[in-house]
Amino acid sequence: MSAIVDIVGREILDSRGNPTVECDVLLESGTMGRAAVPSGASTGSREAIELRDGDKKRYLGKGVLKAVENINTEISESVLGLDASEQAFLDRTMIDLDGTDNKGRLGANATLAVSMAVARAAAEESGLPLYRYFGGMGGMQLPVPMMNVINGGAHANNSLDLQEFMIIPVGAPSFREAVRYGAEVFHALKKILGDRGISTAVGDEGGFAPSVESHEAAIQLILEAIDKAGFVAGEQIALGLDCAASEFYKDGNYVLSGENLTLSAGNWADMLATWVDKYPIISIEDGMHEGDWDGWKLLTERLGKRVQLVGDDLFVTNTKILQEGIDKGIANSILIKINQIGTLTETFAAIEMAKRAGYTAVISHRSGETEDSTIADIAVGTNAGQIKTGSLSRSDRIAKYNQLLRIEEDLGDIASYPGRGAFYNLK
């Protein structure tokens, strides 16, 4: 038995300079696991609650000492002595201890930190790399990265309403080559922007944050960079968008303030469909407001067989909401963010539910990240097939890419890279 003998929570900083929660878990054998949780900027209204202190005199109210105290008192008292290898039982213990539907009492940032740290300790105790601990012998597929090279919306201070413009190296023969494709396009884009006197400052997720005249102008810059780097758009590198449409939904319309446009759901769907016709876009995330299920239904009927339609704010990694979406034929993919739900067990349940329904599951970072690379191991351990972890800059993003490179090396000849096959939800 790998008994838990000590748990220590602490307040650390994330990539935006805001406090977040880190946890150490010590086992009877002396083995220790450590994990830190991320934090989002654009969040779904039904996400599990991230507990903040609210003391404006300290970190502008964003301190997490209450969550840390919950780890060091209530949670610790409840899980000390439990077997670290019994992840589902441990997570259920914390869920029951919290007693709310959204972890609003203890904080999802507290429960997740413990859940992740326990898994790391148990993997170390068993002598397995974390991805192997999660997936057994079946975890051997590297994910296709969706690389956010231009940032807008809540992730940048510019004129773009859409939040992310991504490159997806579907034609790469391996993950290592996919990273190379992405890095070379990133540097080509930086050169193009610099030569035109456009800022090469980066946003929260490491992508550039230029002020350009339109969203199509941003897409065209990326296509130019792909060509400049020597790749073929659509064949070797496809495009993806994260609209984060809940952020610009006002009074029943979609308001693109940067282009001075106010659109109904139907007209907004028409605009997205036009872009799909013109450009090699194969994935659109949060194309409609999280509460606009009629708009989502319209978008799914319009593009659901041609484009991966990812629900992030829509589903918030919650199996109850995902099941409703599956039943109603809404979207065809779910974004998986571990801190939206607050335990690893519930995260894995959402991934499994999506796969059974023929939906893809895209493992994702948050805009506020740390050096913790657990999501890389989750992506491989669950054979998810896709990952979003930012651009090719900022060490908080690169940490995940580097961990995936190590995993690919560890797997050796049995490592696989699905490429376009990761988009099995497209007909």
UniProtKB/Swiss-Prot annotation:
Transmembrane region positions?
none
One GO BP: glycolytic process
Listed A to Z, the keywords are: Cytoplasm, Glycolysis, Lyase, Magnesium, Metal-binding, Secreted
Identify the domain of life. Bacteria
SMART domains attached to this UniProt entry: Enolase_C, Enolase_N
**Binding residues for (2R)-2-phosphoglycerate:** Q163, K337, R366, S367, K388
Annotated Gene Ontology cellular components are: cell surface; extracellular region; phosphopyruvate hydratase complex
Q: What is this protein called?
A: Enolase
The organism named in the record is Variovorax paradoxus (strain S110)
Identify the gene encoding this protein: eno
